[in-house]
Amino acid sequence: QEYLIEAFSDHFFNVPFDSVLKEYNRVLGATIGTKGVGEKRLRELHDLGYLPLQVRAVPEGTRTNIKVPQIEISNTHPNFVWLVNTIETMLSCTMWHTQVSAEVGYRYRKIVNEYAERTCDDNVVRARLLGDFSMRGQESVESATKSAAAFCLSFLNTATVPAILWLEHNYNCDCSKEPVAYGALSTEHSVMCSNFAVDGDEVTQIRRLLC
């Protein structure tokens, strides 16, 4: 929806075609040329007012083997067969990172379940045993948000707060009423270094942080 409906509506269908064509010719004319998709095709798509595509997918959350396609994109109008590959590239680049994070979380959860069963004497919640602290290592807030949301399919701990809002928006949940994800008051190297500069000695620093 974000890309196939909202983005195309805001930046293509709801923009006057002359403006679309001017920008198209400016960018492609200065880089790879404008013969790939000519003005006639663009105008026909703009006049149509929507993307004539059918997207079919396995049910969300389904784990599939390698070589099993998870989505299939088909055109629904004979004049726009060229559109499929264009959209496939965009969908692929928006999906793979989230899918990898979900798979990593799933694999870690299997390991946690196995060894928690072997070594834990209490009924510790398995979903609270690992957490996501990856936000500062991601390339954007959007990537961090979706990656953490995917990880939260297997674990409930994340320091990526925007992921909680993303999950609420997309999955109709409410963190004030049900477990969605949890954060924690914690510290790490930069916090410890900056606080040490303030306190001047380790004992004072630790005492203040614990209190």
Regions of interest found by a model, annotated:
Residues 43-52, 61-64, 70-211:
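Buried, small/hydrophobic-residue-enriched core segments of structured protein domains
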